[in-house]
């Protein structure tokens, strides 16, 4: 996890704070809306102290809590309670059975040691919960639990619920990143710097333009998130093979009522072995963290000692070396890169999970259980680090100007070429300026001086015109207009 920013005198944004380790996951419960009892999801244990030393570097307490055994089982129980309620309303099971089942759908009643033993024995994580629920209900009323459902109905729907909780956190951090980029694009819209192509200086741009390009990309991720939510937040309830045969002519009615109670979209048809929804989440996380890694790469390169144009927020000892006291490593960007690389591999695994056989599969389904929690934690960590960096990013305009001047005018050679193009022809002007650039580089002289010595060029453009063309500030193109275009378009937040 990125630290709180509390010691950076250059920060212009509101003071940062890291996500609190004591944060309690807020989860809505359908049972609070149901008559006759409530499913209690409060009081989940704080899992932050049980994690390893690196856990808050490659994850966050909030995301770990979402993907914990306790929260997963809480989702199972919420689904089982909702199923009992809707089936009682439809007359499929007795109302007193539904009430009894709901009363015992509480994580506090789970024997975790027994559950672990049963899960390892059975190989699937739902039956052990159902067995305990049946046993905890009086008068045999628990026998109506899990009526017409199959294990995958519960696990897939619970996974969808956990994804919804997770993407709520993702959206919060993504929105904060977008806000920071909006601020940086506007604040630095007129700060000139060198664009780089193949790691070489290309032409002048502004730092605000560079930030606006990132802003546009992260806004596209906001759009993708909105779009995928419509497809992903969907109920899975199809019974043994998807056709709900065990519920007779009330199968689809049960499905639709259950979806409504869980605040999920009803599926158009069962999807036990059609895992495109989970794969879409994985590829979205891959795209998002890929952009975070690109951002981290640029910041790392721009913070090199020889460049020094930006720096991560300064906090004493953060990114320090055990051997070199002068070091202030871009440690947040380092971890963003590591998280993104892992998410990409996870996305590939979720695509593998799509290759499931027939109506109920033999294996690829379980890939999702392993990869999604890891991917969500890596994504959350990458987002937190990026949010921290952008909200306190140190920007050094003097260094940007210094680097613009390093080439002694070579960076505006395109401007000179275009200025000569109308009289000499573009290609001829290109070759003439190329030779002048080579001479200026070899002799370590200003390009302007070499251009003035070239009789052909000097005959077409006088000194005043060449001086204007050789000033990087005069060759910023449409940077400001592009920034205006991006900032004028509303965020998808």
From Swiss-Prot:
Pfam families named among the record's database cross-references: ADSL_C, Lyase_1
EC number: 4.1.1.113
Keywords tagged on the record: Cytoplasm, Lyase, Nucleus
Main EC class the enzyme belongs to: lyase
Main location per the UniProt record: cytoplasm
Family: Belongs to the class-II fumarase/aspartase family.
Function: Trans-aconitate decarboxylase; part of the gene cluster that mediates the biosynthesis of itaconic acid and 2-hydroxyparaconate. Cis-aconitate is secreted by the mitochondrial tricarboxylate transporter MTT1. In the cytosol cis-aconitate is converted into trans-aconitate via isomerization by the aconitate-delta-isomerase ADI1. Decarboxylation of trans-aconitate by the trans-aconitate decarboxylase TAD1 then leads then to the production of itaconic acid.
Full protein name: Trans-aconitate decarboxylase 1
The encoding gene: TAD1
């Amino acid at each position: 996890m990125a630290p709180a920013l509390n010691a950076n005198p250059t920060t212009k944004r509101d003071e940062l704070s890291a996500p609190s380790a004591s944060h309690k996951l807020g989860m809505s419960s359908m049972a609070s809306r149901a008559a006759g009892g409530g499913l209690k999801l409060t009081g989940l244990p704080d899992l932050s102290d049980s994690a390893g030393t690196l856990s808050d570097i490659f994850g966050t307490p909030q995301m770990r809590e979402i993907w914990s055994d306790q929260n997963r089982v809480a989702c199972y129980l919420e689904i089982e309670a909702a199923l009992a309620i809707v089936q009682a309303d439809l007359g499929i099971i007795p109302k007193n059975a539904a009430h009894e089942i709901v009363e015992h759908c509480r994580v506090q009643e789970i024997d975790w040691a027994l559950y672990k033993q049963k899960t390892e024995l059975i190989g699937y994580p739902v039956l052990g919960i159902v067995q305990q629920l049946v046993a905890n209900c009086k008068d045999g009323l628990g026998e109506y639990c899990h009526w017409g459902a199959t294990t995958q109905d519960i696990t897939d729907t619970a996974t969808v619920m956990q994804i919804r909780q997770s993407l709520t956190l993702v959206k919060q951090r993504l929105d904060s990143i977008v806000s920071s980029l909006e601020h940086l694009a506007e604040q630095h819209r007129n700060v000139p710097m060198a664009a780089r192509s193949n790691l070489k200086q290309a032409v002048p741009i502004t730092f605000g333009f560079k930030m606006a390009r990132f802003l546009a990309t992260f806004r596209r991720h906001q759009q993708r998130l909105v779009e995928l939510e419509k497809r992903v937040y969907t109920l899975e309830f199809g019974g043994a093979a998807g056709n709900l045969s065990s519920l007779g002519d009330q199968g689809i009615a049960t499905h639709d009522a259950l979806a409504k109670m869980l605040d999920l979209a009803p599926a158009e048809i069962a999807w036990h072995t059609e895992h495109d929804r989970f794969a879409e989440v994985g590829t979205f996380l891959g795209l998002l963290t890929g952009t975070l890694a690109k951002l981290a790469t640029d910041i790392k390169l721009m913070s090199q000692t020889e460049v020094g144009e930006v720096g991560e927020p300064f906090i004493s000892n953060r990114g320090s070396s055990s051997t070199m006291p002068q070091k202030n490593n871009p440690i947040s960007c380092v971890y963003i890169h590591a998280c993104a690389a892992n998410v990409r591999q996870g996305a590939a695994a979720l695509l593998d999970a799509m290759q499931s056989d027939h109506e109920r599969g033999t294996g690829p389904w379980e890939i999702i259980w392993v990869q999604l929690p890891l991917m969500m934690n890596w994504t959350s960590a990458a987002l937190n680090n990026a949010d921290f960096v952008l909200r306190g990013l140190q920007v050094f305009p003097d260094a940007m100007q210094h680097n613009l001047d390093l080439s002694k005018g070579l960076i505006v050679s395109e401007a000179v070429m275009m200025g000569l193009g109308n009289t000499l022809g573009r290609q001829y002007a290109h070759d003439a300026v190329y030779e002048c650039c080579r001479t200026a580089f070899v002799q370590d002289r200003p390009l302007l001086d070499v251009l003035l010595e070239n009789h052909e060029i000097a005959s077409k453009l006088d000194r005043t015109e060449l001086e204007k063309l050789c000033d990087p500030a005069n060759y910023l193109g449409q940077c400001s207009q592009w920034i205006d275009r991006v900032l004028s378009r509303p965020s998808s937040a």
